[in-house]
């Protein structure tokens, strides 16, 4: 028979193990397995992800997990964030719901995940409730997706990666030069329509900044870069003469356009702001 002290110690150890099984996170990404439920197929595990981007991978899903996506720092602006997730095309074995105050709304069925399309929702819409689909054989089932927190321009659709189809104000253009994932000067070579978006082929004479390598150099003495930028189909962009200043964000490895004034118009705005000392950052325009 166990002594009172050993019995107490054993109960503490068991409680710690239960707590670890119910609450887990590594801040940015999470990888887990349904096999850890040890037969409790209706168990629900809490996952907390607090970075701007990361991934989730759930092997052999059983029961359910609740994924809480929140930024590291709390501020009034955080309520304007959208969460975008991109499932792997091999993702299967679960349905994904939005859980707001205990009310579930289907976001992605098991079949929807296989399309690999990006889906966005407002961060205030709740956590993700990911429920395993009952299976006789779970050995080949893996639910996996990437996620990013997106800060949209005012007026943007929180359920889309694209910026609103309206010209940026002078102030928005100047700020975009400082804060965008990519800033470049170039021309539009071609436009192709896709299912829910437009893909624009661009040739760049100046690449001021790119967060990741979405534009590639053509080599040679006359340095030029080429690549693609995405935007909403409703924007109705067409190939045309003249140079533009392209700014935007990189989402899931793709460049999405935000502000794109004609370069001569940007130059006028930038030079005026520079003379008045109101430009928020410097850009080499020579």
Curated annotation (Swiss-Prot):
Primary site of residence: secreted
SUPFAM superfamilies: TIMP-like
Biological process annotations from GO: brown fat cell differentiation; energy homeostasis; negative regulation of inflammatory response; positive regulation of brown fat cell differentiation; response to cold; response to muscle activity
Taxonomic superkingdom: Eukaryota
Family matches, as Gene3D superfamilies: 2.40.50.120
Main function: Hormone induced following exercise or cold exposure that promotes energy expenditure. Induced either in the skeletal muscle after exercise or in adipose tissue following cold exposure and is present in the circulation. Able to stimulate energy expenditure associated with the browning of the white fat depots and improves glucose tolerance.
PANTHER family the record matches: METEORIN-LIKE PROTEIN
Protein family per UniProt: Belongs to the meteorin family.
The protein's name: Meteorin-like protein
Species this chain originates from: Danio rerio
């Amino acid at each position: 028979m166990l002594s009172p002290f050993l019995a107490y110690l054993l109960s503490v150890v068991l409680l710690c193990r239960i707590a670890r099984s119910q609450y887990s996170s590594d801040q940015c990404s999470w990888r887990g397995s349904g096999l850890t439920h040890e037969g409790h197929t209706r168990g629900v595990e809490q996952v907390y992800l607090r970075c701007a981007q990361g991934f989730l991978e759930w092997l052999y899903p059983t029961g359910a997990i609740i994924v809480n996506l929140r930024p590291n720092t709390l501020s009034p602006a955080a309520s304007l964030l959208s969460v975008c997730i991109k499932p792997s095309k091999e993702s299967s074995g679960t349905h994904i719901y939005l859980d707001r105050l205990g009310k579930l709304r289907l976001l992605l069925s098991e079949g929807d995940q296989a399309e690999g399309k990006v889906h966005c929702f407002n961060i205030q819409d709740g956590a993700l409730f990911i429920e395993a689909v009952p299976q006789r054989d779970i050995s080949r089932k893996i639910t996996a997706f990437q996620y990013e927190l997106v800060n949209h321009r005012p007026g943007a659709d929180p359920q889309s990666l694209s910026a609103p189809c309206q010209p940026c104000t002078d102030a928005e253009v100047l700020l975009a030069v400082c804060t965008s994932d990519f800033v470049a000067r170039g021309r539009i070579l071609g436009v192709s329509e896709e299912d829910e978006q437009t893909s624009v082929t661009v040739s760049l004479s100046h690449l001021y900044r790119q967060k990741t390598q979405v534009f590639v150099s053509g080599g040679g003495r006359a340095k030029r870069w080429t690549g693609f930028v995405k935007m909403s189909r409703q924007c109705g962009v067409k190939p045309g003469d003249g140079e533009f200043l392209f700014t935007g964000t990189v989402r899931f490895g793709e460049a999405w356009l935000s502000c794109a004034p004609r370069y001569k118009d940007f130059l006028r705005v930038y030079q005026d702001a520079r003379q008045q000392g109101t430009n928020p950052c410097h850009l080499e325009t020579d």
